[in-house]
Amino acid sequence: MEERKHLRGAHVRTTWARVRATVRAIVCAGLYPNVAEVRLPDTKYLATARGAIETANEEARLVKYFVPGHGRVFIHPSSALFSATHFHKSPWLVYSSKQQTAKLYLRDVCLVSPMALLLFGGELSVQHEKQTIVIDGHITLAAPARVAVLVREMRTELQKLMARKIAEPAFDMNAGSVLDGIIKLLTSDGAE
């Protein structure tokens, strides 16, 4: 019985992770090209008898945000991410609008994964020698060229799927593996 509860809990967590990743990707698609880069402060270490350990930096003011063409910007105090100090998976966020007061603030922000940016962002260009993919000339992600090829193929398949759904509203988009593949990529951020 206890094992069944544990498995049910694991299933709920996995389902929630899939839903959360999918919703964030949809938000990314809807708000793109409003993308900001998150720059964390340098990591600090504390010397201990067993070696150096990373210390947690709890000061949100040390986290910096940048928007191409505007330089440094700030998260609006009403945002849920205003006091955030941990950005585990992605140094990118999307925002709905900018507001200029004493500072330039971003409103309604949402963290997005690199995979969401690759799938739903702008034009991709590959820099083979640097092993990077650049989105719209200003969002640089470290990845081999083969990732760009696969992402382009996924984008093409998704566009075909969406075009068919528009042409045939009764078409079941869940019938194929394209959507499942995209959701798995978003959930794992391409790690699988």
Regions found by a protein language model. Give the residues of each.
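C-terminal accessory domains/tails appended to large, multi-domain proteins
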Residues: R4-L7, H11-E192
